[in-house]
């Protein structure tokens, strides 16, 4: 399995997963997860994509995929968007369900030893706001980005669309 960012047009990026059987012949990749949602490129000087892209095998039919918000904060809380989420993907048909929202740039996914109900997720937050989260596989978890974070924006400014309140619990988040 390979996750990658696909540039659909000059200003549209989305996330795909393909797979191939390893052999001595050229690899023939088949689509596993194809989604037409995209985020727009920005022309900012510091253009970190915050794309996520970590995969974790759950069982023979499902993988998890972390998808960052690509610096488009509002997408993390939008349940109609795959961005700023962790997805459980059925590799047989590409269908997915959201297991975590309110993520900025989820980079690490790991199983917990002797536990199939939770995973461990690491996330690059804003300045001083990296997170380690224990995520339930049995319900949708909301980790609050961009409403709550213990970090600060790198430019030091307060943003209306991403206020970064310093409490997750006070705002109803994990």
What do the PLM-derived regions correspond to, one by one?
Residues 1-73, 108-125, 174:
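Acidic, Gly/Ser/Thr-rich repeat motifs that build Ca2+-stabilized beta-propeller blades
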Residues 62, 69-174:
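Beta-propeller domain segments
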